[in-house]
Amino acid sequence: VISVNDMRESHFRIGTVGKVIDGVTVKIAEDGEILCKGPNVMMGYYKEEEKTKEVMSGDYFHTGDIGEIDADGFLKITDRKKEMFKTSGGKYIAPQVIENQMKQSLFIEQIMVVGAGRKMPAALIQPNVEYVINWLKEEGVSCTSLAAAVKETKLIEAFQNEIDTHNQHFGSWEQIKKFQLTPEEWTIDEGHLTPTMKLKRKVIKDKYDGLIESMYA
């Protein structure tokens, strides 16, 4: 345990994991990873020097989580380091942060940010089927399937407006410049999602490799 949300003395903030407990020191590495040291942190793995070097920098333990500490001292976890990637320009991208922001749009059911080693991040998007079909109907366009809906120019323009709106929360290097709408829903049964509804990133990347390449063509 390195931090606690405590109801006493207003030491509680929704969306964070609380304030760092006494005796523990937390710092944020250059790539955004949360590092900590204190009496609750191990010295290393028993007789596993190489394994220890992977997770320890001096007295600091690498948590594997990406996060930030706000002005009031509350610690917030925003992503997992293993899901972060670097663009060809050397900028680190935390995809989950961008995805969570974009999913505030009623148009978006699922989204996966890609772009490792590329000049910019881009996104694969699974639209909210019921919402977009109803939206198109109100716009005078009749569609009965997602596959048909994603080809409609009006819908693509609406998604561009949504992306542009939510891009304002990010730096220029993090903004989604290109996106593709997938013609089917992402489901557990089809292998897109885990039983807890998390993205199976490799599966999705492999399945839509053609769409990804088209965004960087």
Regions found by a protein language model. Name each.
Residues V1-D6:
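Adenylate-forming
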Residues I66, A71, S105-Y131:
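C-terminal boundary motif of the adenylate-forming
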Residues R80, A116-M120, E174-I176:
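Short Gly/Ser/Thr- and Asp/Glu-enriched loop/turn motifs at secondary-structure junctions
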Residues S10-V17, V41-G64, I98-E99, G140-V150:
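Conserved ANL (AMP-binding/adenylate-forming) active-site segment centered on the GW(Y/F)…HTG consensus within
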Residues F85, Q110-M112, W135, Q160-A217:
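Conserved C-terminal "lid"/linker of ANL adenylate-forming enzymes
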